[in-house]
UniProtKB/Swiss-Prot annotation:
This is Capsid protein. One of its GO terms (cellular component) is T=3 icosahedral viral capsid. Its main location: virion. InterPro entries: Tymo_coat (IPR000574), Viral_coat (IPR029053). Self-assembles to form a T=3 icosahedral capsid composed of 180 copies of the capsid protein. The capsid encapsulates the single-stranded RNA genome. Keywords: Capsid protein, T=3 icosahedral capsid protein, Virion. It is found in: Virion. The lineage of its organism: Viruses, Riboviria, Orthornavirae, Kitrinoviricota, Alsuviricetes. GO terms for molecular function: structural molecule activity. It comes from Kennedya yellow mosaic virus (strain Jervis bay). Belongs to the tymoviruses capsid protein family.
Amino acid sequence: MATNHVLASQLPVNTKSSEIPLQSGTPPPTIIYPFQIEMASLGTADASDSISIASNSLLASVTTLYRHAKLTSLKATIHPTGQAPAFPTTVALAWVPYNSTATSAQILSVYGGQMFCIGGSINSLSPIDVPCNLTNVNPIIKDSVTYSDTPKLLLYSIAQETAPTLATCSVTITGTLTLHSPLLQATA
């Protein structure tokens, strides 16, 4: 079943993360790892969260056997459920660097922050994609050093006064990681 997605790009900021060039010679073999993680089910109550991609436990378990991990794509998607037409839900999202002091309550004050009404009789029930512009943040989530400007998703949701017991929408984070340089460990 094909679904139309609404693309809601966050405006870019002209910044570049600092990248130390790899040593000369043959680049190490890499593995491209696609992932999708459900981060929140919304609509049953008001919610706010600040989600660090680099410290996500599911991604940490994937990267544990490698010394280096870099995001090559990243997006948040809002998926409406069957409850959405009867119970519209407000959802606000913004991608920021981890060291940003912006909070979930300040999303519309963040450059590129966006708010959506999910559901209702007039609004679209198509999934909404909010891609992370990886030039605004540092895409390296695992390295020999820890970075403080990796991607963070700010999320804020307002439910109806008479909220349903089932979620009206879910938020997932989808992307691809490039992994390289196995971490040498004992096998026994």
